[in-house]
Amino acid sequence: AAAISCVGSPECPPKCRAQGCKNGKCMNRKCECYYC
């Protein structure tokens, strides 16, 4: 099964979404990377 990338997911603020994260992580509201 392929890992689903959540970078750019709606719960992340646009400025965080624009930055993105590596390794399939997503930006939280503090612009910190976390695993979904």
From Swiss-Prot:
Compartments, as annotated in UniProt: Secreted
The name this protein goes by in its record: Potassium channel toxin alpha-KTx 23.1
Tissue expression profile of the protein: Expressed by the venom gland.
Domain of life: Eukaryota
Swiss-Prot/TrEMBL site (Basic residue of the functional dyad) positions: 25
Domain observations: Has the CSalpha/beta fold, which comprises one or two short alpha helices connected to anti-parallel beta-sheets stabilized by three or four disulfide bonds. Has the structural arrangement of an alpha-helix connected to antiparallel beta-sheets by disulfide bonds (CS-alpha/beta).
GO molecular function, one term: toxin activity
Protein task: Voltage-gated potassium channel inhibitor. Selectively and irreversibly binds (K(d)=2.9 pM) and blocks hKv1.3/KCNA3 potassium channels of human T-lymphocytes. Weakly blocks hKCa3.1/KCNN4, mKv1.1/KCNA1, and hKv1.2/KCNA2 channels. In vivo, high doses (200 ug) produce no symptoms of intoxication when injected into mice.
Assigned protein family: Belongs to the short scorpion toxin superfamily. Potassium channel inhibitor family. Alpha-KTx 23 subfamily.
Record key words, sorted: Amidation, Disulfide bond, Ion channel impairing toxin, Neurotoxin, Potassium channel impairing toxin, Secreted, Toxin
Pfam families noted in UniProt: Toxin_2
One term under GO cellular component: extracellular region
Cysteine amide modifications at: 36
Comment field (misc): Negative results: does not block hKv1.4/KCNA4, hKv1.5/KCNA5, rKv2.1/KCNB1, hBK, hERG, Nav1.5/SCN5A channels when assayed at a concentration of 10 nM.
Residues carrying the site annotation Aromatic residue of the functional dyad: 34
Disulfide bond positions: 6-26, 12-31, 16-33, 21-36
